[in-house]
Amino acid sequence: MKKYDFETSLDRRNTSSTKWNIKKDEISLSLADMDFKVASEIEEDLKKVISFPIYGYVDISEEWYSAYQKYFLDEYDLKIEKEEMMFSLGVVPSISSSVRKFTDVGDNIVVLSPVYNIFYNSRVNNFRNVIEVPLLRKEDEFFIDFPSLEEAFKDEKTKMIIFCNPANPVGKIWSKEEMKKLGELAKKYDVLVLSDEIHGFITRTGKKYIPFFSVSEINRDISLTCLSVTKAFNLAGIHTSCIFAFNKDIYKKINRQINTDEVAEPNILSCTAAVSALTKGKDWLY
């Protein structure tokens, strides 16, 4: 296994870094951004793209599709068809597009708090209501309050739950049983599950996240999944993400919306970064 340097922290001040665009004596606690180098394999692949001196429009590469397919087949024995995948510039744009497509102004969106603040921003920016269902805590574990969740789902204005899997910021890796129960409740009350799985590639040693859609046929049918390599591989500045949707109606709707919102076309580095991370980054990650 190749050795990587995770001890040297690079000075990112004066590089337009959002994380480090602060005053001299301030401490940056704002973003989940790493300060050591990306995997050298990814760096080299990106350099190859840049070395060709034309930076025009690009299409989604076949390698992009096959890299995600191979990863989930190898890691989870899950077969995903090309027609069940779509490119998006980022998980956050995908969430906002989903909110606009699958809910209306004044509808309710459920979140399990505490959770990533952007989930609230997507609501505010699109004039939806957020219903918080606080997680239950027992010692060092967090659990879903299913009775309270069901009450939130019973409201006829509730159309969606944005589910963070694994949970950010508490780090909870949800069990199959928890996600199966969530899927059954969502099905019962006709609530769409948007599963944000951007942190699925990076978990504690010995702990492996479970894709929401993999738990049951119900979960597969009533959800869409948003994920990206950007958090795990420190590539957030290169806009690249993926959406999985297995229900054909859901697929058609979100595919139309991300195209309407103009977030469905890659930049010149988007596909290469994802392919390199998925096919060459495992040693760096583990």
Give the role of each language-model region.
Residues K79-M85, V105-N108, R220-S223:
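Short acidic capping loops at alpha-helix termini that bridge into adjacent secondary structure
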Residues N126, K188-Y189, N219:
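Helix C-cap/helix->beta junction micro-motif
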Residues L135-K207:
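Active-site phosphate-binding strand-loop segment of PLP-dependent enzymes
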